[in-house]
UniProtKB/Swiss-Prot annotation:
Keywords: Crown gall tumor, Plasmid. It holds the Pfam family RolB_RolC. This is Protein 6b. It comes from the Bacteria. Transmembrane segments: none annotated.
Length: 206
């Protein structure tokens, strides 16, 4: 089913790692109970009333997209996913927000991204002081993993943020009206409509 009016959980006032873990798990369970086992969320540009091919299977653990406070708040309020690299759009990781201090997390995030995204981790640890908790859609890929204290944490990437789709559709010379829609999507490539389950600040950033 499509995402109804899911209220993004604001966890910015929680400083305890244990409480944050519990609240995130509750948000994950509530999200699945609200939307069901499969979730379509982007309206089709071609077929009114239908959805595109991107979907989320909700029987999965949370993944985290890290950002600065202003970007995280804006994305949470508007249900948007920010890009963090020019080569594949949005980067996400299974590393939970309480596990590492900001400088160490920043070093790991820089290893999997470049300086071309809306969120540029190369500007410093403040760029990963907040998080967006999400579930991965079907177009996320797993390019690698990070090992921390003997535990492997997967690193994921969402390809393109509509940039590749827009280029392909232009090459196919679609009708003028459709091209205008795709042009707008191309210009908004650093942000893509996406279900955000919760957002907050990293306890070690306080």
């Amino acid at each position: 089913m499509a995402v109804p009016r899911w209220a993004v959980r604001d966890l910015t006032q929680i400083s305890s790692a244990r409480e944050l873990s519990l609240r995130l798990e509750q948000a994950r369970n509530d999200f699945r109970a609200t939307v069901g086992s499969i979730c379509y969320f982007n309206a089709s540009a071609r077929t009114p009333g239908q959805f595109d091919d991107e979907y989320i299977m909700t029987d999965q653990s949370l993944t985290y997209v890290y950002a600065d406070g202003v970007t995280a708040q804006s994305c949470a309020m508007n249900r948007l996913l920010p890009s963090s690299s020019s080569n594949f759009g949005a980067a996400a990781t299974a590393i939970p927000p309480w596990l590492l201090d900001p400088p160490r997390l920043n070093r790991l995030l820089r290893e999997g991204t470049d300086e071309g995204g809306l969120v540029n981790y190369y500007e410093g640890p403040h760029k990963n002081a907040f998080f967006l908790a999400i579930m991965r859609s079907c177009i996320f890929v797993r390019p690698g993993a990070d090992e921390i204290n003997g535990v492997s944490y997967d690193f994921f990437a969402r390809s393109g943020n509509y940039t590749e789709q827009a280029e392909e559709e232009e090459e196919e010379e679609e009708e003028e009206e459709e091209e205008e829609v795709l042009d707008r999507e191309f210009q908004l490539g650093n942000l893509v409509s996406y279900p955000i389950i919760a957002w907050g600040s990293c306890p070690n950033s306080a």
